[in-house]
């Protein structure tokens, strides 16, 4: 059944009672009439609200896969006066049960991104539905089903577009009050109580009929008087219980009875985004947030996941053809030109973007692996050019791909059905590949007859192919007589996903010809030969990192890098499994390495690895480079080669082959 609240009936002669007829007609998308009803109404006052119930037994429910909408035509007749209105609506019921989200009795999982009100041509949001069909359609194309509007409520066109596309929206007031952003906290101003209560009620009244409006938060990262937020939430929820409510987006806090869910980066004091557990995530593909789910009494949504800085594409300056001037990108371009790295910008974008995509995948899969997790919200699929410039997106601020991943590639790990693979990342040839297989299964229908099709490749060669209904793998790696990187693809029906693992041969420790003092360095340059120059003799020692700058190197001042470019074909790396960009086999090496600045226009210095500088620092550095000096060929190595790990042993072996002239 459907409960309809009719429009307020305004009678201009309140002293006089009258009567009229209300006629309801419901049509489907094709215009077919699916329900009709006529009711007599007595009018008593200048304004009244009547309730009517229309049976609609065969109604199709609205959701992300079948966003069915109906049109209600309401006609009121009173004597010779006639008034008529049309309202679009969808049938759906959102609820929480056992700490899970249910839409019409079926569990849903949120895969979201955040809209931070970026409009580079106008400075304000479009008011036509077509523009939002394109903008929101991009999120849908990338496999997402959810958009959170960060500290703002979008216009009618957004809800209409989301209704049509089948997107689950979270809406907020323009409420972002905490001292960290240099504004008062909630309740510091007496006007907060009346203004924000009325704002929340107005949002509910204006947009409440839209089926896409599933979630409401008072605002972003609010601190202060939570009793005021509780009053607002309780009041609005009592009037309109058709959606779910939370006090604020972000900040773990004692949950109140009016809250249906928690959106934060910590839940019950457990992290729910990889930022706070990168070392654990680097060890394997098994990280999840089960402890947070167990200890939190409501569904948990991980807040602002990602925020991995990608080097900016300043070529977008030419695209600002409207009211906005990109003075931030103009400044970035000027700094890059002054530092002599502007011509490398596309290489920097590719390298930093590749790392960001890898880390976004890890963040997303950790959420998908977590049983009964509420979902995640990325920050963000697109760049955010405010707050001192945060180019954290795989798409630019115009919503265009940076060429890092296609939508289809992104959907493989962020869509409604995603195969998952839990295993270590680094093995030796004496071990077995032990892995657990599972399926994140939130498609239109549950997957039947689950079968995993597993293919493991080394380059183009198939190392192993297995079809199994068992969710476990136990594969010997002893047939490999060399170190290798293996690509594991797990397919279930038409859905597939891939991971890279690294297998290191049982390599003995290698002694490297090394110069230890400035005098030894000077001598070999005179006599000739090859030798390793350790970090102690670097002209400067700049710390390296694997995880890129968080959010923005301007907002959070940092000299950290944003990825690394690798000359994988260089002879010094012929024995070390790597591609052109860093993967997890490099994490421990890079985080214990130092680099030196690459001199401008010095062809004697040939970087094998080049750190991608952040756009505020723009200092190109290298932890591993060949330097031709005098008669010598010197291998400057900033890696700590003392740990007895498979990766270090293999890198030393590979470097040793180069220094000995074997490659």
Where in the sequence are the language-model features?
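Catalytic beta-strand/loop cores that center a nucleophilic Ser/Cys/Thr
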Residues: 537-540, 552-647
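Active-site-proximal beta-strand elements of phosphoester/diester hydrolases
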Residues: 109-114, 300-304, 511-516, 631-639
């Amino acid at each position: 059944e459907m409960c309809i609240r009719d429009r307020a009936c305004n009678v201009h002669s309140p002293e006089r009672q009258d009567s009229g007829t209300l006629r309801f007609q419901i049509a489907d998308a094709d215009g077919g009439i699916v329900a009709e009803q006529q009711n007599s109404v007595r009018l008593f006052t200048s304004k009244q609200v009547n309730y009517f119930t229309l049976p609609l037994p065969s109604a199709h429910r609205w959701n992300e896969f079948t966003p069915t909408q109906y049109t209600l035509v309401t006609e009121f007749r009173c004597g010779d006066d006639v008034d008529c209105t049309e309202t679009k609506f969808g049938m759906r019921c959102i609820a929480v049960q056992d700490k899970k989200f249910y839409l019409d009795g079926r569990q849903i999982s949120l895969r979201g991104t955040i809209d931070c009100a970026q409009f580079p041509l106008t400075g304000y949001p479009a008011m036509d539905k077509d523009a939002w069909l394109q903008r929101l359609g991009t999120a849908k194309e990338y496999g997402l089903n959810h958009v959170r509007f960060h500290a703002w409520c979008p216009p009618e066109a957004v809800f209409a577009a989301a209704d049509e596309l089948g997107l689950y929206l979270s809406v907020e007031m323009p409420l972002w009050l905490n001292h960290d952003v240099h504004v008062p906290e909630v309740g510091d101003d007496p006007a907060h109580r009346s203004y924000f209560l009325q704002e929340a009620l107005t949002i509910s009244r204006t947009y409440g009929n839209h089926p896409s409006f599933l979630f409401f938060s008072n605002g972003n990262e609010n601190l202060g008087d939570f009793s005021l937020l509780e009053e607002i939430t309780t009041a609005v929820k009592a009037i309109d219980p058709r959606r779910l409510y939370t006090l604020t987006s972000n900040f773990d806090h004692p949950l109140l009875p009016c809250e249906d869910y928690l959106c934060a980066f910590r839940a019950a004091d457990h992290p729910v985004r990889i930022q706070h557990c990168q070392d654990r995530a680097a060890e394997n593909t098994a990280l999840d947030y089960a402890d947070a789910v167990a200890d939190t009494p409501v569904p948990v949504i991980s807040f602002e996941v990602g925020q991995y800085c990608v080097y900016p594409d300043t070529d977008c300056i030419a695209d600002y053809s409207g009211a906005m001037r990109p003075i931030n990108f103009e400044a970035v371009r000027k700094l890059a030109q002054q530092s002599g790295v502007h011509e490398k910008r596309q290489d920097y974008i590719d390298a930093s973007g590749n790392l960001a995509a890898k880390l976004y995948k890890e963040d997303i899969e950790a959420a998908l692996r977590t049983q009964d997790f509420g979902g995640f919200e990325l920050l963000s699929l697109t760049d955010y050019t405010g707050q001192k410039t945060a180019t954290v997106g795989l798409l630019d601020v115009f919503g265009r791909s940076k060429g890092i991943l296609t939508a289809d590639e992104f959907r493989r790990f962020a869509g409604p059905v995603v195969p998952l693979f839990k295993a270590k990342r680094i093995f030796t040839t004496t071990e077995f590949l032990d892995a657990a297989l599972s399926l994140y299964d939130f498609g239109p229908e549950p997957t039947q007859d689950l079968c995993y099709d597993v293919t493991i490749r080394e380059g183009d060669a198939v190392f192993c192919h297995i079809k199994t209904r068992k969710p476990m793998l136990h594969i010997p790696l002893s047939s490999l007589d060399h170190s290798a990187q293996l690509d594991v693809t797990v397919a279930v029906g038409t859905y597939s996903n891939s991971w890279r693992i690294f297998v290191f041969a049982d390599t003995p420790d290698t002694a490297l010809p090394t110069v230890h003092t400035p005098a030894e360095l000077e001598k070999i340059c005179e006599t000739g030969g090859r030798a390793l120059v350790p970090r102690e003799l670097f002209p400067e020692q700049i710390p390296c990192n694997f995880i890129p700058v968080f959010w923005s190197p301007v907002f959070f001042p940092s000299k950290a890098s944003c990825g690394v470019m690798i000359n994988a074909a260089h002879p010094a790396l012929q024995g070390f499994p790597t591609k052109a960009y860093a993967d997890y086999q490099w994490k421990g090496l890079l985080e214990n390495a130092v680099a030196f600045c690459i001199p401008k226009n010095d062809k004697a210095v040939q970087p094998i690895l080049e750190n991608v500088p952040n756009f505020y620092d723009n200092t190109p550095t290298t932890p591993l480079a060949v330097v031709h000096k005098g008669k010598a060929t010197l291998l400057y190595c900033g890696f700590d080669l003392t740990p007895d790990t498979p990766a270090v042993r293999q890198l030393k072996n590979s470097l040793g082959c180069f220094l000995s002239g074997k490659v």
